[in-house]
Amino acid sequence: MITKIDKNKVRKKRHARVRSKISGTESRPRLNVFRSNKNIYAQVIDDVNGVTLASASNLDKDFGSAESKVDAASKVGELVAKRASEKGITSVTFDRGGYLYHGRVKALAEAARENGLEF
């Protein structure tokens, strides 16, 4: 019998492999991306202290509206970059969360770069 591969399980395994190698510090925090079927979330995390420094998602009150999921991801990238720069964060380590660097993840990353985050 052929069994179907659970994509999320494989993604979590990939993410765990990446997380063993990268970690966010206070001077260079980690920009983490989580993507569900409907929404996208981004957090700037200091792993040393275990603190989220800035976050954004398309569920935020000041988000507005977006025509597509990719458009929403780029707006979330703008929001998280602005909130991080308000806290004095300019340089981050990008953690794509085990997702491919394509589509919504790529749109979020490029928008964050355009709005002042370096990675």
Curated annotation (Swiss-Prot):
Q: What do the Gene Ontology cellular component annotations say?
A: cytosolic large ribosomal subunit
Keyword annotations for this protein? Answer: Ribonucleoprotein, Ribosomal protein, RNA-binding, rRNA-binding
Respond yes or no to whether keyword Ribosomal protein is given for this record.
yes
Q: How does it assemble?
A: Part of the 50S ribosomal subunit; part of the 5S rRNA/L5/L18/L25 subcomplex. Contacts the 5S and 23S rRNAs.
Stretches with biased composition (Basic residues): 9-20
One Gene Ontology biological process: translation
Annotated HAMAP family? Ribosomal_uL18_B
Record-linked CDD domains: Ribosomal_L18_L5e
PANTHER family listed in its UniProt record: 39S RIBOSOMAL PROTEIN L18, MITOCHONDRIAL (PTHR12899), LARGE RIBOSOMAL SUBUNIT PROTEIN UL18M (PTHR12899:SF3)
Family to which this protein belongs: Belongs to the universal ribosomal protein uL18 family.
GO MF annotation list? 5S rRNA binding; structural constituent of ribosome
Give me the gene this protein comes from: rplR
Its function? This is one of the proteins that bind and probably mediate the attachment of the 5S RNA into the large ribosomal subunit, where it forms part of the central protuberance.
InterPro entries with a match to the protein in the record: Ribosomal_uL18_bac-type, Ribosomal_uL18_bac/euk
**Region annotation Disordered: residue ranges?**
1-25
Name of the protein: Large ribosomal subunit protein uL18
